[in-house]
From Swiss-Prot:
The name this protein goes by in its record: Anthranilate synthase component 1
Name of the coding gene: trpE
Regulation: Feedback inhibited by tryptophan.
The organism of origin for this protein: Buchnera aphidicola subsp. Schlechtendalia chinensis
Enzyme Commission numbers on file: 4.1.3.27
Cofactor(s) listed in the protein's UniProt record: Mg(2+)
Membership in a protein family: Belongs to the anthranilate synthase component I family.
Source lineage: Bacteria, Pseudomonadati, Pseudomonadota, Gammaproteobacteria, Enterobacterales
Binding site for Mg(2+): E360, E497
Binding partners and assembly: Heterotetramer consisting of two non-identical subunits: a beta subunit (TrpG) and a large alpha subunit (TrpE).
Protein's GO biological process: L-tryptophan biosynthetic process
Amino acid sequence: MCEHLKSMDVLKVETFYQPNPTAIFHHICRNRSNTLLLESAEINNKKNLESMMIVDSALRISALNMVVTLEALTKNGESLLPVFKSLLPKEVRILSNDNFLKIKFPSIVKDIDEDKKLHVLSIFDSIRFLINSVKNNKGSKSMFFGGLFAYDLVSSFENLPKLKTSQSCPDFCFYLSEILLVLNHKRRTCYIQASLFSSSNLERNKLQHRLLEVKNKLSQNFYPLESTSLKKMILKCNRTDREYEKIIKEMKKSIMIGEIFQVVPSRKFYLPCTNSLAAYDVLKKNNPSPYMFFMQDSNFTLFGASPESSLKYDTLSRKIEIYPIAGTRPRARKIDGSIDLDLDSRIELEMRTNHKELSEHLMLVDLARNDLAKICDPGTRYVADLTQVDKYSHVMHLVSRVVGKLRLDLDVFHAYQACMNMGTLSGAPKIRAMELISNAEKEKRGSYGGSIGYFTASGTLDMCIIIRSAYVENNIATIQVGAGIVLDSIPQLEVDESKNKAKAVLQAISESHSCHIELNIENERHTFAG
């Protein structure tokens, strides 16, 4: 079959460095679907590190339940579909057979050995088949996929309650880059890359022309980011403080009788959001984070500034990392809004020595160790950093880093399948905690608690947990936040923590729409005039 595989070529041009990725995205991508901006900043000094932007996508691959959809967005992307179809095993049914290819995978027997389950045919194989459609694809970013794995993807692999949803978020959604723009903020360099999958000279000429077009756009004056003004914002939540506190108390009962040790129930806040990019721009300026993202899909927009890595893998070293965060405190501020350094340091010390926070954190470090033990070579797993503190605009977190060496018989998708969803967004034991979450929340989480980032055909993967984020559909932003509950949890403090976690995103939306809101949430609806 190898003679049928596609050969790819990478066309690359260096261009002018621009320090403002949001302005570039607005200037080049505007409101086009299937575009993505991924950014990173130093935790300590908040300086930008790297920005990657999918300007044009060749193909969109998504999954919902056991059905995978491949949508060719260009002729270049379309050229991959015949080879992809030839790689499908007979167990996979083709439901529609055109540029909008739909395929159905068989359901997985969920009550089998964990290691056997990793090797059973699954929707993750659709990504593997797509990667394997191209034979010379191992350049560092030559075959670059950006997008998300939803929290609810786990339901295809574990026996969890079936839930309703009002959102259009699939179980996973990734764009295969056709035009990728990469900014290195430390070196102040920029290059644009085109990935050519078609053997057609016409397609090659199109991509060469598109490279020059994007390069020329970078030398033009940028369109200013439009300002949006709303006279009032109605802030809603799906659960009042009292209702959320009741759920927390019920979860504590499950902990007391020994069903679970820790669990992360969540609540949702809703705000109007008619200018998502402006809100993202404010969020990243106010709250620079290791992972910042703006995903513009045909059905939704997702943006955020996440402090927490989900899974990170380096192909050369085979090193795989989990970065558990558990333990949160608000930053201390003076009346003028600046950080009160003395009080801030005392709050940090209290968090570092708090029995409840330490027990919750160490429980999740242990869970991360157990997750990696399933997929790593024996003797390679260790805790690289333990109970450090990372500080952001509104909160500080207790963090650790757990590292191992991935087994040779596994790839990053096996690793993700084995580790989802991260314990810091589910609990321990993980499956029972997720069952209790489903029973309490009664609807799908969608993007919240899943992950967003990128992977390449060479095997590199870097994803963050989707928190401190807004999922926007029909001009309504959903901001979902949770609190880690253990035996020592004080319900009112956990309610307060959920609101502290929401503040940065809610403030960014209100500021970008010139409308003031407050966070005194006791009823389901409040009007905040600005």
